[in-house]
């Protein structure tokens, strides 16, 4: 376990935590890495076959030592071998405010737990996840196989205002929610989803924007598009082609919901804007369902 606490970087002079030779510093097994402070850049590290701990990498060095205005870039997270147990593990937990996670590769996660989790508190995090490659993730067979989750149902009425843009999602088949949105005010823009057996799911929360994304099913079973639950979402300028999912995995699926739904239920779709989307050769273009 490596924890770096309260690193005092500044915007003008950030602190760098980096491999002397990129790609040759490898964390593996029951390793854990956490850091806190501000204006810290972590780069060039490899995290391989991580298991046995709930969070492999965290933007914090303890529950009361949280990072702010930091960046994780040019790192690799991968599972290359079968793990000795199937204990739930999240590869990356993003705590704090205004972090950037970019230019990284994630692939092969086969155990339970989201690949990346953004935690939501009373103060909007305003994070950015951009230019990452999320490679193949095999089907888990149960919940807990999201590639990205932003928030949880109990805080889903709070704003995160996280931006997820210009990422490549490739065969992310962990579960039906490739991205699980569970907070308010987030933006998903210019991402490409290729052969992913699931959807970008606005599961909880309101006022999110899904703009300019590309969903390519290539005829693969269960490939889906955008699933909408909640109020005042905007789904605009997206492209859907050869998706084979139906019902909740249709190209665009809107939930009828439950009146007076609890936070962990299904809030009806209200005041959604769904315009200027292109749907080509999909099994089911638009579905309104309970």
Residues covered by each model-derived region:
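Beta-solenoid repeat scaffold
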Residues: 1-26, 33-44, 68-70
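Glycine- and acidic/polar-rich repeat regions and solenoidal domains
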Residues: 2-5, 29-36, 48-70, 74-290
């Amino acid at each position: 376990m490596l924890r770096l606490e309260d690193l005092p970087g500044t915007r003008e002079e950030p602190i760098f935590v980096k491999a002397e030779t990129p790609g040759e510093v490898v964390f593996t097994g029951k390793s854990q890495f956490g850091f806190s402070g501000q204006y810290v850049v972590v780069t060039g590290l490899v995290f391989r076959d991580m298991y046995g701990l709930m969070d492999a990498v965290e933007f914090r060095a303890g529950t009361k030592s949280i990072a702010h205005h930091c960046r994780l870039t040019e790192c690799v997270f991968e599972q290359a071998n079968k793990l000795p147990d199937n204990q739930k593990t999240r590869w990356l937990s993003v705590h704090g405010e205004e972090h950037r996670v970019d230019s990284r590769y994630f692939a092969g996660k086969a155990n339970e737990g989201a690949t990346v989790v953004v935690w939501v508190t009373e103060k909007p995090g305003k994070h950015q996840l951009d230019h990452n490659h999320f490679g193949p993730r095999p089907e888990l067979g149960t919940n807990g196989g999201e590639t990205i989750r932003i928030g949880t149902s109990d805080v889903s009425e709070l704003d995160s205002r996280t931006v997820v843009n210009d990422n490549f999602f490739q065969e992310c088949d962990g579960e039906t929610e490739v991205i699980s949105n569970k907070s308010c005010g987030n933006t998903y823009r210019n991402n490409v989803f290729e052969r992913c057996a699931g959807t970008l799911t606005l599961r909880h929360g309101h006022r999110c924007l899904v703009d300019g994304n590309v969903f390519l099913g290539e005829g693969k079973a269960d490939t889906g598009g955008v699933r909408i639950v909640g109020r005042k979402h905007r789904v605009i300028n997206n492209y859907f082609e050869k998706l084979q999912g139906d019902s909740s995995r249709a190209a665009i699926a809107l939930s009828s919901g439950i009146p007076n739904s609890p936070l962990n239920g299904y809030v009806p779709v209200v005041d959604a804007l769904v315009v200027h989307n292109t749907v080509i050769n999909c099994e089911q273009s638009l579905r309104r369902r309970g």
